Amino acid sequence: MESITRVSMSVCPFVKSSSAQALRQLSKNSALTSQARQCPFMGAALNAKESTRSYSSATKPVRATASSLASNPPSTMQSKYSFKAEELVGNKDAINLESKENTFDFKGYLNSELSKKRTDKSYRFFNNINRLANEFPKAHRSEENDKVTVWCSNDYLGMGKNENTINEMKRVLTKYGSGAGGTRNIAGHNIHALKLESELAALHKHEAALVFSSCFVANDAVLSLFGQKIKDLVIFSDELNHASMIQGIRNSRAKKQVFKHNDLADLEEKLAQYPKSTPKLIAFESVYSMCGSIAPIEAICDLAEKYGALTFLDEVHAVGMYGPHGAGVAEHLDFDAHLKSGIASPQTQTVMNRVDMVTGTLGKAYGTVGGYITGKANLIDWFRSFAPGFIFTTTLPPSIMAGSSASIRYQRSTLQDRIAQQTNTRYVKNNLTDIGIPVIPNPSHIVPVLVGNALDAKKASDLLLDKYNIYVQAINFPTVPIGQERLRITPTPGHGPELSNQLIGALDSVFNELSLSRIGDWEGKGGLCGVGEPDIEPIEHIWTSEQLALTDADINPNVIDPVIQPIGVSSGVRD
């Protein structure tokens, strides 16, 4: 449009000599059309347009006859003012289509940006990995007979192959079809969404929940909404927060304070800079996925209460994995109390009910897809009413939501998958450390192996895949800082001692073949990320030996097929 305007201003005497105000005034009535008829080009175009109107007026449909076509061939039916497009384009005096200005070089820009990523070795290649449900944790590559063992999936508990989940998805898929049919506001609000949100609220022992298409969307939508709606809000963000949280904070346009990772002193120093009346929100994760560290949730809640801040806790890498029922690290911190009370809330205050908001995913430990947030009923209703990321997107398919509910119910009633996963994780960590492989120390289920160079990390990943049929993804910038590149290993209940020994032996060989730095080498360099650093105290796993000794007989029977009352918040709250 701007290009047409510029051309018109340069070639049309009428437009050139008229002010913008005059043109706007003329456009409000027929005067502009009258003036346009005096133009040799616009006049012809207007006459041609009007001459065709009789052919598009409302008439009864009739069948064309050969005689009518013969008496009125197409060429004679055209207006005498009609003209061919190529005639107008070819008239150099009419419109000059060649701009004298240089256009932006989009192609050059894109190629330059991609070239930079290739140069710094952060350009990403996606491996074709097709996980096999009946052979978990196996997968095949592009050819079905080319099978590998997957060691880096986020399907932490193997729920992607769980019969309860799959059967429920099949049942609902057959009855309700493949899609939801609309947004939650228009034809996409259904019993499956209500059931899933009720399950999630009960899991986290919060008043209500809201399901999003992914947790990236949930984090972005919620955090951006806070900043856009609450004047003078300050968001305090851990420096290792996930990209979805960073994006949400950026989109919020709120003032932000980034505090050092898990550093309570730094967080308090920043909180203390603002009056208690200033609205504040602390955004952090429970398990940080690339290093495996765990946040001091209880202490952060203490600071939030002291300085009048809301707490926003991302439990994406913890739901399903921690706590007696899989509600995450916040539940795990009061393990015995929640184990005893089951589906009910403990009589005493817990960390879980001190956290204002919890976001989580259905796409990792629960084996499906989607994200969610839980919290107070009025908070959830506010998100439902104002968050564009929720309002203007199609609802998850009914089968996905039903399968997710089945996964939550299953994991709530068993400890065995979590215990098996933690047991296998300890086995891998201990044996890798024993042979000097630099595992970044942490208390969680993540096994990050430090490489420290993007090219070497890619070579190690490729060698494991091509030579040993083991798939471990290399992690590089911007997911981790430059110089801290690593291999990220995530054992599951299916990675028992036999597969674990294969991985340990393969990594040992790869480190030798590529001359990668081991723990002793990192010690000589002064250490990095907790590997080879002096005065590093041993880190205890969050799952204790006593907890790993529990069985399903220790679970409160009230969690097995409990009657969970539907929560109607996402339908709208009646006055």
UniProtKB/Swiss-Prot annotation:
GO terms for molecular function: 5-aminolevulinate synthase activity; pyridoxal phosphate binding. It comes from the Eukaryota. This is 5-aminolevulinate synthase, mitochondrial. Catalyzes the synthesis of 5-aminolevulinate (ALA) from succinyl-CoA and glycine, the first and rate-limiting step in heme biosynthesis. It comes from Debaryomyces hansenii (strain ATCC 36239 / CBS 767 / BCRC 21394 / JCM 1990 / NBRC 0083 / IGC 2968). Residues 1-55 form a transit peptide. Its EC number is 2.3.1.37. It is an enzyme of class 2 (transferase). Belongs to the class-II pyridoxal-phosphate-dependent aminotransferase family. The keyword Oxidoreductase does not apply. Gene3D superfamilies: Aspartate Aminotransferase, domain 1, Type I PLP-dependent aspartate aminotransferase-like (Major domain). The keyword Mitochondrion applies. PANTHER family: 2-AMINO-3-KETOBUTYRATE COENZYME A LIGASE, MITOCHONDRIAL, CLASS II AMINOTRANSFERASE/8-AMINO-7-OXONONANOATE SYNTHASE. Keywords: Acyltransferase, Heme biosynthesis, Mitochondrion, Pyridoxal phosphate, Transferase, Transit peptide.
